[in-house]
Protein backbone atom coordinates (compact mmCIF):
# COMPACT_ATOMS: atom_id res chain seq x y z
CA UNK A 1 0.00 0.00 0.00
CA UNK A 2 1.10 3.55 -0.71
CA UNK A 3 0.40 6.48 1.59
CA UNK A 4 1.08 10.14 0.87
CA UNK A 5 2.07 12.36 3.79
CA UNK A 6 1.68 16.12 3.48
CA UNK A 7 3.26 19.08 5.27
CA UNK A 8 0.97 22.11 4.69
CA UNK A 9 2.36 25.56 3.95
CA UNK A 10 3.07 27.98 6.81
CA UNK A 11 2.87 31.46 5.23
CA UNK A 12 2.51 33.01 8.69
CA UNK A 13 6.24 32.33 9.24
CA UNK A 14 8.93 34.72 8.04
CA UNK A 15 10.86 31.74 6.68
CA UNK A 16 9.15 28.39 6.15
CA UNK A 17 12.37 26.51 5.45
CA UNK A 18 14.27 26.68 8.73
CA UNK A 19 13.46 23.41 10.50
CA UNK A 20 11.73 20.52 8.77
CA UNK A 21 8.81 18.99 10.69
CA UNK A 22 10.37 15.86 12.17
CA UNK A 23 7.16 14.35 13.57
CA UNK A 24 5.64 13.47 10.21
CA UNK A 25 9.03 12.24 8.99
CA UNK A 26 9.14 9.87 11.98
CA UNK A 27 5.76 8.52 10.89
CA UNK A 28 7.07 8.12 7.34
CA UNK A 29 10.04 6.15 8.68
CA UNK A 30 7.75 3.86 10.69
CA UNK A 31 5.67 3.19 7.58
CA UNK A 32 8.72 2.46 5.44
CA UNK A 33 10.06 0.09 8.09
CA UNK A 34 6.86 -1.93 7.65
CA UNK A 35 7.27 -1.94 3.85
CA UNK A 36 4.69 0.74 3.05
CA UNK A 37 5.47 2.91 0.05
CA UNK A 38 5.54 6.56 1.16
CA UNK A 39 5.28 9.75 -0.88
CA UNK A 40 6.02 13.00 0.94
CA UNK A 41 4.73 16.35 -0.27
CA UNK A 42 6.44 19.17 1.59
CA UNK A 43 4.52 22.38 0.88
CA UNK A 44 6.58 24.59 3.19
CA UNK A 45 7.11 27.88 1.38
CA UNK A 46 5.08 26.76 -1.64
CA UNK A 47 2.58 29.44 -2.70
CA UNK A 48 1.00 27.44 -5.53
CA UNK A 49 0.44 24.43 -3.30
CA UNK A 50 -2.86 23.51 -4.95
CA UNK A 51 -1.07 23.26 -8.30
CA UNK A 52 1.53 20.97 -6.73
CA UNK A 53 -1.21 18.75 -5.34
CA UNK A 54 -2.99 18.74 -8.69
CA UNK A 55 0.18 17.58 -10.43
CA UNK A 56 0.54 14.78 -7.88
CA UNK A 57 -2.99 13.43 -8.17
CA UNK A 58 -2.61 13.29 -11.94
CA UNK A 59 0.29 10.85 -11.68
CA UNK A 60 -0.35 7.15 -12.21
CA UNK A 61 1.50 6.23 -9.01
CA UNK A 62 -0.49 8.45 -6.66
CA UNK A 63 -1.56 7.22 -3.24
CA UNK A 64 -5.15 6.68 -2.13
CA UNK A 65 -4.49 7.30 1.58
CA UNK A 66 -3.31 10.72 2.71
CA UNK A 67 -1.97 11.88 6.05
CA UNK A 68 -1.65 15.56 6.94
CA UNK A 69 0.03 17.18 9.94
CA UNK A 70 -0.98 20.60 11.22
CA UNK A 71 -0.18 23.11 13.88
CA UNK A 72 -3.03 25.49 14.75
CA UNK A 73 -2.21 28.15 12.11
CA UNK A 74 -1.74 25.41 9.51
CA UNK A 75 -5.25 24.00 10.01
CA UNK A 76 -6.99 26.22 7.39
CA UNK A 77 -4.49 24.98 4.81
CA UNK A 78 -4.88 21.38 5.95
CA UNK A 79 -8.65 21.68 5.51
CA UNK A 80 -8.25 23.14 2.02
CA UNK A 81 -5.86 20.33 1.10
CA UNK A 82 -8.21 17.66 2.41
CA UNK A 83 -11.19 19.13 0.58
CA UNK A 84 -9.21 19.48 -2.63
CA UNK A 85 -8.14 15.83 -2.55
CA UNK A 86 -11.66 14.56 -1.93
CA UNK A 87 -13.25 16.84 -4.52
CA UNK A 88 -10.70 16.09 -7.23
CA UNK A 89 -10.45 12.35 -6.57
CA UNK A 90 -14.00 11.25 -5.68
CA UNK A 91 -13.98 7.53 -5.12
CA UNK A 92 -10.19 7.34 -5.41
CA UNK A 93 -9.33 8.77 -1.99
CA UNK A 94 -9.94 6.05 0.56
CA UNK A 95 -8.94 8.11 3.55
CA UNK A 96 -7.61 11.53 4.61
CA UNK A 97 -6.04 11.51 8.09
CA UNK A 98 -5.23 14.56 10.22
CA UNK A 99 -2.64 14.52 12.99
CA UNK A 100 -0.28 16.95 14.66
CA UNK A 101 -0.29 19.43 17.54
CA UNK A 102 -3.60 21.20 16.85
CA UNK A 103 -5.89 18.19 16.81
CA UNK A 104 -4.02 16.73 19.80
CA UNK A 105 -4.49 19.85 21.93
CA UNK A 106 -8.11 20.35 20.87
CA UNK A 107 -8.97 16.76 21.69
CA UNK A 108 -7.26 17.09 25.08
CA UNK A 109 -9.28 20.23 25.79
CA UNK A 110 -12.48 18.57 24.56
CA UNK A 111 -11.98 15.69 27.00
CA UNK A 112 -11.59 18.19 29.84
CA UNK A 113 -14.77 19.99 28.74
CA UNK A 114 -16.68 16.71 28.66
CA UNK A 115 -15.44 15.83 32.15
CA UNK A 116 -17.04 19.09 33.34
CA UNK A 117 -20.27 18.35 31.41
CA UNK A 118 -19.40 21.27 29.12
CA UNK A 119 -20.08 23.78 31.89
CA UNK A 120 -18.34 27.03 31.01
CA UNK A 121 -17.09 26.09 27.55
CA UNK A 122 -17.47 23.66 24.67
CA UNK A 123 -15.26 25.42 22.13
CA UNK A 124 -12.75 22.58 21.85
CA UNK A 125 -15.54 20.01 21.47
CA UNK A 126 -17.02 22.06 18.61
CA UNK A 127 -13.60 22.31 16.96
CA UNK A 128 -13.06 18.55 17.10
CA UNK A 129 -16.55 17.87 15.75
CA UNK A 130 -15.89 20.31 12.91
CA UNK A 131 -12.61 18.57 12.05
CA UNK A 132 -14.42 15.24 11.93
CA UNK A 133 -16.51 16.62 9.08
CA UNK A 134 -13.42 17.37 6.99
CA UNK A 135 -11.21 14.37 7.80
CA UNK A 136 -11.85 10.64 7.96
CA UNK A 137 -9.64 10.02 11.00
CA UNK A 138 -8.10 12.30 13.63
CA UNK A 139 -4.90 11.02 15.25
CA UNK A 140 -4.21 12.65 18.61
CA UNK A 141 -0.79 12.27 20.22
CA UNK A 142 1.97 9.91 19.09
CA UNK A 143 1.49 8.89 15.48
CA UNK A 144 4.34 6.46 14.87
CA UNK A 145 2.29 3.42 15.94
CA UNK A 146 -1.20 4.90 15.58
CA UNK A 147 -0.79 5.48 11.85
CA UNK A 148 -1.20 1.79 11.04
CA UNK A 149 -4.63 1.56 12.63
CA UNK A 150 -5.57 4.99 11.26
CA UNK A 151 -5.18 3.57 7.76
CA UNK A 152 -7.69 0.77 8.38
CA UNK A 153 -10.00 1.92 11.19
CA UNK A 154 -13.59 3.05 10.86
CA UNK A 155 -13.27 5.12 14.03
CA UNK A 156 -13.16 8.90 13.69
CA UNK A 157 -10.60 9.46 16.46
CA UNK A 158 -7.51 7.54 17.56
CA UNK A 159 -6.49 8.78 20.99
CA UNK A 160 -2.75 8.20 21.35
CA UNK A 161 -2.58 11.13 23.78
CA UNK A 162 -3.15 8.79 26.70
CA UNK A 163 -0.45 7.04 28.72
CA UNK A 164 -2.60 3.88 28.81
CA UNK A 165 -2.96 3.78 25.04
CA UNK A 166 -1.16 1.05 23.12
CA UNK A 167 0.00 3.80 20.76
CA UNK A 168 1.62 5.98 23.45
CA UNK A 169 5.37 5.60 23.00
CA UNK A 170 7.51 4.22 25.81
CA UNK A 171 11.18 5.13 26.33
CA UNK A 172 12.14 1.87 24.67
CA UNK A 173 9.88 2.33 21.65
CA UNK A 174 11.10 5.89 21.19
CA UNK A 175 14.67 4.59 21.14
CA UNK A 176 14.21 1.73 18.68
CA UNK A 177 11.91 3.43 16.18
CA UNK A 178 13.74 4.50 13.01
CA UNK A 179 15.00 8.09 12.71
CA UNK A 180 13.04 10.63 10.64
CA UNK A 181 12.85 9.79 6.93
CA UNK A 182 14.71 12.93 5.89
CA UNK A 183 15.50 11.38 2.50
CA UNK A 184 11.88 12.04 1.50
CA UNK A 185 12.29 15.83 1.56
CA UNK A 186 14.77 18.28 0.10
CA UNK A 187 16.93 18.83 3.17
CA UNK A 188 19.21 21.22 1.28
CA UNK A 189 16.32 23.70 1.05
CA UNK A 190 16.21 24.08 4.84
CA UNK A 191 18.55 26.82 6.03
CA UNK A 192 19.58 27.00 9.67
CA UNK A 193 23.05 27.61 10.98
CA UNK A 194 24.91 27.71 14.28
CA UNK A 195 27.82 30.15 14.29
CA UNK A 196 27.79 30.04 10.50
CA UNK A 197 27.76 26.23 10.33
CA UNK A 198 24.74 24.69 8.51
CA UNK A 199 22.71 22.70 11.01
CA UNK A 200 19.88 20.18 11.21
CA UNK A 201 17.47 19.55 14.05
CA UNK A 202 17.43 16.42 16.20
CA UNK A 203 14.99 15.33 18.91
CA UNK A 204 16.40 13.25 21.76
CA UNK A 205 13.53 13.69 24.21
CA UNK A 206 9.76 14.11 24.13
CA UNK A 207 7.73 15.97 26.71
CA UNK A 208 8.10 18.69 29.32
CA UNK A 209 7.00 18.03 32.93
CA UNK A 210 6.66 21.65 34.01
CA UNK A 211 3.45 23.66 34.48
CA UNK A 212 4.14 27.00 32.79
CA UNK A 213 0.80 28.78 32.60
CA UNK A 214 1.43 30.09 29.09
CA UNK A 215 1.87 26.57 27.66
CA UNK A 216 -1.15 25.13 25.89
CA UNK A 217 0.35 21.65 26.09
CA UNK A 218 0.47 21.36 29.86
CA UNK A 219 -2.67 19.18 29.96
CA UNK A 220 -1.59 16.82 27.18
CA UNK A 221 0.27 13.63 28.24
CA UNK A 222 1.79 13.52 24.75
CA UNK A 223 3.46 16.86 25.42
CA UNK A 224 4.01 16.46 29.17
CA UNK A 225 5.22 12.90 29.71
CA UNK A 226 8.99 12.60 29.44
CA UNK A 227 10.20 9.99 26.94
CA UNK A 228 13.93 9.86 26.30
CA UNK A 229 15.89 8.05 23.65
CA UNK A 230 18.94 5.99 24.52
CA UNK A 231 22.26 7.75 24.14
CA UNK A 232 23.23 5.14 21.55
CA UNK A 233 20.26 5.89 19.30
CA UNK A 234 20.92 9.64 19.42
CA UNK A 235 24.60 9.22 18.58
CA UNK A 236 23.73 6.87 15.71
CA UNK A 237 21.39 9.48 14.23
CA UNK A 238 23.90 12.31 14.59
CA UNK A 239 26.63 10.19 13.01
CA UNK A 240 24.31 9.21 10.16
CA UNK A 241 23.49 12.87 9.46
CA UNK A 242 27.19 13.72 9.42
CA UNK A 243 28.03 10.85 7.06
CA UNK A 244 24.97 11.36 4.80
CA UNK A 245 24.73 15.14 4.56
CA UNK A 246 28.08 16.29 5.93
CA UNK A 247 26.18 18.00 8.74
CA UNK A 248 28.38 19.56 11.42
CA UNK A 249 25.73 21.60 13.21
CA UNK A 250 22.98 20.10 15.33
CA UNK A 251 20.05 21.81 17.00
CA UNK A 252 18.63 19.64 19.78
CA UNK A 253 15.01 20.67 19.70
CA UNK A 254 14.06 19.07 23.01
CA UNK A 255 12.12 21.24 25.45
CA UNK A 256 14.89 20.90 28.03
CA UNK A 257 18.00 18.80 27.44
CA UNK A 258 18.76 18.60 31.13
CA UNK A 259 15.63 16.79 32.25
CA UNK A 260 17.26 13.79 30.60
CA UNK A 261 19.24 11.97 33.29
CA UNK A 262 21.64 10.77 30.58
CA UNK A 263 22.39 14.26 29.28
CA UNK A 264 26.00 14.34 30.51
CA UNK A 265 26.80 10.92 29.05
CA UNK A 266 25.21 12.00 25.76
CA UNK A 267 27.45 15.09 25.66
CA UNK A 268 30.47 12.90 26.39
CA UNK A 269 29.55 10.53 23.57
CA UNK A 270 29.18 13.50 21.22
CA UNK A 271 32.76 14.40 22.16
CA UNK A 272 33.87 10.86 21.34
CA UNK A 273 32.04 10.96 18.01
CA UNK A 274 33.83 14.15 17.00
CA UNK A 275 37.18 12.65 17.94
CA UNK A 276 36.35 9.51 15.95
CA UNK A 277 35.76 11.49 12.76
CA UNK A 278 38.25 14.29 13.41
CA UNK A 279 35.57 16.96 13.17
CA UNK A 280 34.26 19.82 15.29
CA UNK A 281 30.49 20.06 15.67
CA UNK A 282 28.45 23.12 16.56
CA UNK A 283 25.67 22.22 18.98
CA UNK A 284 22.69 24.12 20.35
CA UNK A 285 19.84 23.22 22.69
CA UNK A 286 17.59 24.37 25.51
CA UNK A 287 18.03 23.75 29.24
CA UNK A 288 15.93 24.39 32.35
CA UNK A 289 17.86 27.03 34.28
CA UNK A 290 16.96 25.84 37.77
CA UNK A 291 18.13 22.31 36.90
CA UNK A 292 21.40 23.42 35.34
CA UNK A 293 24.55 22.20 37.09
CA UNK A 294 28.27 22.78 36.78
CA UNK A 295 28.69 19.19 35.58
CA UNK A 296 26.17 19.75 32.80
CA UNK A 297 27.83 23.02 31.81
CA UNK A 298 31.24 21.37 31.63
CA UNK A 299 29.89 18.51 29.50
CA UNK A 300 28.16 20.91 27.11
CA UNK A 301 31.28 23.03 26.83
CA UNK A 302 33.39 19.98 25.97
CA UNK A 303 30.88 18.83 23.36
Predicted regions and their residues:
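Glycine- and acidic-residue-enriched helix-capping/strand-helix junction motifs
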Residues: 12-24
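Radical SAM [4Fe-4S] cluster-binding motif and immediate context
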Residues: 175-303
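Hydrophobic/aromatic residues located in beta-strands of well-ordered beta-sheets
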Residues: 3, 95-96, 250, 283
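Glycine-rich beta-alpha loop elements in corrinoid/cobalamin-binding modules
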Residues: 2, 30, 34-171
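Residue-level signal for short, function-critical loop segments
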Residues: 9-12, 72, 102, 206, ...
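Nucleotide-activated donor-dependent transferases that construct or modify glycoconjugates
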Residues: 2-14
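Conserved strand-to-helix beginnings and helix N-cap segments that scaffold or border functional pockets
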Residues: 17, 50, 78-79, 144, ...
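Residue-level recognition of beta-strand->loop/alpha-helix junctions
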Residues: 7, 42-44, 219
Amino acid sequence: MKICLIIPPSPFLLDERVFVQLGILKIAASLEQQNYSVDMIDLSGVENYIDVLNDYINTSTRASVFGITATTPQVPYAVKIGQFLKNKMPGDVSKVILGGPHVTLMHTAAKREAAKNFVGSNRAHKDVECLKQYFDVLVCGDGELAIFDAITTNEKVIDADNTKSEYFLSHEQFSVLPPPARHLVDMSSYKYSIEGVPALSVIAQLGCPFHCTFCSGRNSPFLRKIRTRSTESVIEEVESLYLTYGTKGFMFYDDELNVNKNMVSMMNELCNLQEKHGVDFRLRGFVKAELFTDKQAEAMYRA
